[in-house]
Amino acid sequence: MITVISPEELVQNETEIINQLFQEGLDLLHIRKPFINQNEMTDFIQKIDSEFHSQLVLHSHYNLADNFNILRFHFREIDRKNGLSQSFTDKTISTSVHDIETFNELNEEWEYAFISPVFPSISKKGYGENSNILNDIKKRDNSNVELIALGGINENNIHHVFDNNVDGVALLGAIWESNQPLNVFKKCKQNINY
């Protein structure tokens, strides 16, 4: 599975790029826009082809889901700990963790979890420089939750990530820091046995 996470800030031609990514086989798009209001989020989602709405995952503005046939929700680590996800257990929910021990403790209510940073971040300079997560994934003993690697993954290292017992990857900086995001996505797909 290849997931793309939106940048926090709006990017020029972002929804056009998103539609093209879906047309090229993107599995899921996580919409993480913490700084936009309800109307801006509505406009953003409306610009994504409705045939792809079931592949969208909301990180906020959960109340918009019914308007757009969105059944997937992501909860930050702090929100998971505070029980925010409890009213969404009949939906598809995901979360984030930052170590394999926490991942191994997740129960089956979570479809998948991002684990990060796998490599030094592309979008957050200096973050993840000394990460051992890719090595720590070998200690995975939770088969109830899919493990999605995040952080510094690009077309040059994606194959190495898939060689390490992950169920998928999430791309952020590799896509949105590139002048040719669609080409990067295509190369990522080509560089794994997908």
Show which residues each predicted segment covers.
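Conserved N-terminal beta1-alpha1 strand-loop-helix module at the mouth
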Residues: M1-K81, Q86-Y112, D141-L147, I153-N165, ...
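Flexible, gly/ser-rich surface segments that form the specificity/activation loops bordering the active-site cleft
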Residues: S116
